[in-house]
Amino acid sequence: MSIKPILTAEQLTALWQRRAATRAYDPAKKIPDSDFEAILQAGRLSPSSVGSEPWQFLVVQNRELRAQLKPVSWGMATQVDDASHLVVILAKKNARYDSPFFDDIIARRGFTGEAAEAARAKYARFQIHDADILASERSVFDWACKQTYIAMANMMTAAAALGIDSCPIEGFDYAEVNRILAGAGCFDAQEWGVSVMLTFGYRTANIKPKSRKPIEEVVRWIR
């Protein structure tokens, strides 16, 4: 079954050329609800390893919470006050094949009986042998965090397609951000942890052209 392209190759490249990490937003310009819903759907509908979806998206619009996050989040210090939306992406802790979390995955995918047991055996083989991620709680959490970056990238691409700017944020004190948000009742720190953050809005000025390696340096064809 063929799918009719929505964008040409040239339009897609132009979209990526325009997308850039935005450090300053127009505080007077807010993202329409319908557009931001589409961005959230891009995250929700993203692919993840073995269909795990080990994420939650916190949309932090509370100004008091943003003010608390600002001094411990140097990567968004120039953005957090003026960004239309701030999203904190959480990753699931202890997302093991033998956990209740994976029970939900199996049920959601409609597996029962022998099919459910076969699915769990497949997930076990992947986590124990193929990916080898069960050495520690941290290694399982890091695996879950990897999945959140897929969702983050899709959300930024969706935003760019809608003419909305964004910036991925890793520059923050993870322990403090977790403490602030969990302490405010935003999530259960036994079950979830902060993976990465994103700001969204509309840039206030032109951003200098991208500095990227030429494609010949980053792509090798093995024929």
Q: Which ranges hold each PLM region?
A:
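Acidic, surface-exposed loops and disordered segments
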Residues: M1-R223
